[in-house]
């Protein structure tokens, strides 16, 4: 019963709004001050239009006095005083005066007027928990038994004649404090009674967030969304992110008014889009792509491949690449040598120049800023796995000044955005963060921090973000400095999770001590490891569509890519410590090998753990499918790469493997890299003489499948072998 009582007011109010919101109340006028049309002002207008409020903006085009909005409220009083001159005698006209940059409407005119009249005063000011700007005035405030005690000048409502009296005595400067002016009037008992002023102590009309963040929560009900004040169990009509609470207003503004609900999802995501349909390649917006390689990064070759796969003509793209790492110098130069001419232009800042991270990012943004033909700046860090080729188009079509696609780390909640900031400006988890990351809430979100990948309009870089040093701010890291500077300019940063764009790489355990370091990334970055090293037709094999049986109980299917084969061979040759191919072998228990080969064991290159992960993830599922009823944990004592050469060890004598089953992966190509070779199963008199590169043979080991390695007659043959479940 208690729950029903709590929910009833919201349902009743929403029902009342839906009946009368089609036309705004004729005796209500909303006045606000906006010297320029910021994104905050456009949000305010959109929420007002949603409820059909009549809005009149005062002061557009005027300069705002004061610094950082700490002063300058006097301009608002002057403009209001002038605007009221033509309304001073309209006794029935109700005027709502409110800030706009950091305000959203949560309900419509009918509810607003009803609550105003219920206040039984001619003028109602918003109320705050904190006194400002003169704390010495606290003792003069009337004592309040229930509710907020102090006046807030960010919003008030009253009859036009009373508001005219309120501002009649204003003769201050534009840079003076409006808050102090209204406070002194309110604290004068005679004027307070004469004008008939009261405060909205219980936040029935106005919700100032400063000092009240813990009181306000989102309330979803009946396909609607409101802000509920838990302290007073009220549903405010206007939400004001005053003082340091603008980011919380951005969070609430993602939902209010009815912009996102559980029933409808995002109701405004398709508003104001910039369609690219039907536009020829030559007419598409010009984009500068900034690529940043700031630390050793795995799968850089995949990064460049994905960049090339973007569904956007290269001739409309310019490249700016900052490579801080000598380790990646050859890869970057190879990419540019092969594909640089495909782009409109290329600028490379390499490790030899020693440009710091923040300075390089400033360079990239400024290249677009200085070029009037640059419509967008697309910044992408090398640890971004951009798997959606349409990402750039999708971001452009969303038509935001600054927007980032959601990227997360595999299997983790780590992402490229923050939903909230702590008091000291660092990460804090918003209520909706997990739902956004995991896709339970889908939309376009106003957030305080983005990183790794984002799109900025060139027009924004030449206007609101024209400051050339975007990536320095106090002692913050470049990513945080960038976001702090954007927030300081009242530019919104948006994040979209409307599509699956890709993911972030984990760089925490990346090694650079090997020839091909990506081979060791199967734990940290399994998706990228699979893309680079597992054969594209492996999933078909797992579905039973590409599995052959050339000999009884010998299965043959694709497992490795060409790259996997080549890099494993090159890694072994780089290590170079091949065994001698005799029976004495100190690498194995007992020191004696019955059937010796010239090989290198996986544990010699510290690859044993990674190889076991490969067996568990990709071989074990095939084993269980091909040998029904057998389950394996893919344990092994021996896993190695064998080298066959005519003048070294051309073949292998008949033998049984010390395994329950064996895999034998061909690492190079017969007829190209070598001639001869293959495997013969003696009991079945069955031979496989043309192994396919990247395909593995899987067969039982001991007891049934007695086999030999056929002679390699020319070149060098490599195979990777594992004796599984010995």
Swiss-Prot record:
Listed PROSITE patterns: FE2OG_OXY, LYS_HYDROXYLASE
Keyword Transmembrane recorded: no
Keyword 4Fe-4S in record: no
Its membrane topology: Peripheral membrane protein
Coiled coil start-end: none
Residues in Fe2OG dioxygenase domain copies: 635-726
Keyword field: Dioxygenase, Endoplasmic reticulum, Glycoprotein, Iron, Membrane, Metal-binding, Oxidoreductase, Signal, Vitamin C
Signal peptide (UniProt feature, chain positions): 1-18
UniProt EC number: 1.14.11.4
Domain of life according to the entry: Eukaryota
Protein residues bound to Fe cation: 655, 657, 707
Any single biological process term in GO: collagen fibril organization
Cellular component terms (Gene Ontology): collagen-containing extracellular matrix; endoplasmic reticulum; extracellular space; Golgi apparatus; rough endoplasmic reticulum membrane
Glycosylation (residues): 196, 537, 685
Role, per record: Part of a complex composed of PLOD1, P3H3 and P3H4 that catalyzes hydroxylation of lysine residues in collagen alpha chains and is required for normal assembly and cross-linkling of collagen fibrils. Forms hydroxylysine residues in -Xaa-Lys-Gly- sequences in collagens. These hydroxylysines serve as sites of attachment for carbohydrate units and are essential for the stability of the intermolecular collagen cross-links.
Alphabetical list of PANTHER family matching this protein: PROCOLLAGEN-LYSINE,2-OXOGLUTARATE 5-DIOXYGENASE 1, PROCOLLAGEN-LYSINE,2-OXOGLUTARATE 5-DIOXYGENASE/GLYCOSYLTRANSFERASE 25 FAMILY MEMBER
Annotated protein name in UniProt: Procollagen-lysine,2-oxoglutarate 5-dioxygenase 1
Annotated source species: Bos taurus (Bovine)
Taxonomic placement: Eukaryota, Metazoa, Chordata, Craniata, Vertebrata
Gene transcribed to yield this protein: PLOD1
């Amino acid at each position: 019963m208690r729950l029903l009582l709590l929910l009833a007011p919201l349902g009743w109010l929403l029902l009342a709004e839906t009946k009368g919101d089609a036309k705004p109340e004729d005796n209500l006028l909303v006045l606000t001050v906006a010297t320029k049309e910021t994104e905050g002002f456009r949000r305010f207008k959109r929420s007002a239009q949603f409820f059909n409020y009549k809005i009149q903006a005062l002061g557009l085009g005027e300069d705002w006095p004061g610094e950082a909005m700490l002063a300058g409220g006097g301009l608002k009083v002057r403009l209001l005083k002038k605007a009221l001159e033509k309304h001073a005698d309209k006794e029935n006209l109700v005027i709502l005066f409110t800030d706009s940059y950091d305000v959203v409407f949560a309900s419509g005119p009918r509810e607003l007027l009803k609550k105003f009249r219920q206040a039984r005063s001619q003028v109602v000011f918003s109320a705050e928990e904190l006194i400002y700007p003169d704390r010495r005035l606290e003792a003069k405030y009337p004592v309040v038994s229930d509710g907020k005690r102090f006046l807030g000048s960010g919003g008030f409502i009253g009859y036009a004649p009373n508001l005219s009296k309120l501002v009649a005595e204003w003769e201050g400067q534009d840079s003076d404090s409006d808050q102090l002016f209204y406070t002194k009037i309110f604290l004068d008992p005679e004027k307070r009674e004469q004008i008939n002023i009261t405060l909205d102590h219980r936040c029935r009309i106005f919700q100032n967030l400063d000092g009240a963040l813990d009181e306000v929560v989102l309330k979803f009900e009946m396909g609607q969304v409101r802000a509920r004040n838990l302290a007073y169990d009220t549903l405010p009509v206007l939400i004001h992110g005053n003082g340091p609470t603008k980011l919380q207003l951005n969070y609430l503004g993602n939902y209010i008014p009815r912009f996102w609900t559980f029933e409808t999802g995002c109701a405004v995501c398709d508003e104001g889009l910039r369609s690219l349909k039907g536009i020829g390649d030559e007419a598409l917006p010009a984009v500068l792509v900034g690529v940043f390689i700031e630390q050793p990064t795995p799968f850089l070759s995949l990064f460049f491949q994905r960049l090339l796969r973007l569904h956007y003509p290269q001739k409309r793209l310019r490249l700016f690449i900052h490579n801080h790492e000598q380790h990646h110098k050859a890869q970057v130069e190879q990419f540019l040598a092969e594909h640089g001419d495909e782009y409109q232009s290329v600028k490379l800042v390499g490790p030899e120049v020693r440009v710091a991270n923040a300075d390089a990012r400033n360079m990239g943004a400024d290249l677009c800023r200085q070029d009037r033909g640059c419509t967008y700046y697309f910044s992408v860090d090398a640890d971004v796995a951009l798997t959606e080729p349409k990402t750039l188009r999708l971001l452009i079509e969303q038509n935001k000044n600054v927007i980032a696609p959601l990227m997360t780390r595999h299997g983790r909640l780590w992402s490229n955005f923050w939903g909230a900031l702590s008091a000291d400006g660092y990460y804090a988890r918003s209520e909706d963060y997990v739902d956004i990351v995991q896709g339970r809430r889908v939309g376009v979100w106003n957030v305080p921090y983005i990183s790794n990948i984002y799109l900025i309009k060139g027009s924004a870089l030449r206007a609101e973000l024209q400051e050339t040093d975007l990536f320095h701010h106090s002692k913050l890291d470049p990513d945080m400095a960038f976001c702090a500077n954007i927030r300081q300019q009242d530019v919104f940063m948006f994040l979209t999770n409307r599509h699956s764009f890709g993911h972030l790489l984990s760089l925490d355990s990346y090694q650079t001590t090997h020839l091909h370091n990506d081979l060791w990334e199967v734990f940290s970055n399994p998706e990228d490891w699979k893309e680079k090293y597992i054969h594209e037709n492996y999933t078909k094999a797992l579905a039973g569509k590409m599995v052959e049986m050339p000999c009884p109980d010998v299965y043959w299917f694709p497992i490795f890519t060409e790259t996997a084969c080549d890099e494993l061979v090159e890694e072994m040759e780089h290590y170079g410590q091949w065994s001698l191919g005799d029976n004495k072998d100190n690498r194995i228990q007992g020191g004696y090998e019955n059937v010796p080969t010239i090989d290198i064991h996986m544990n010699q290159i510290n690859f044993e753990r990674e190889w076991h992960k490969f067996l568990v993830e990709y071989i074990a599922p095939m084993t269980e499918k091909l040998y029904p009823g057998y389950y394996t944990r893919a344990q092994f004592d021996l896993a190695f790469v064998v080298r066959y050469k005519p003048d070294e060890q051309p073949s292998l004598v008949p033998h049984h493997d010390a395994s329950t089953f064996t895999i034998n992966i061909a690492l190079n190509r017969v007829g190209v890299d070598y001639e001869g070779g293959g495997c013969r199963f003696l009991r079945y008199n069955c031979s496989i003489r043309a192994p396919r590169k990247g395909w593995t043979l899987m067969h039982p080991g001991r007891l049934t499948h007695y086999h030999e390695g056929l002679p390699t007659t020319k070149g060098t043959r490599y195979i990777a072998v594992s004796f599984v479940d010995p």
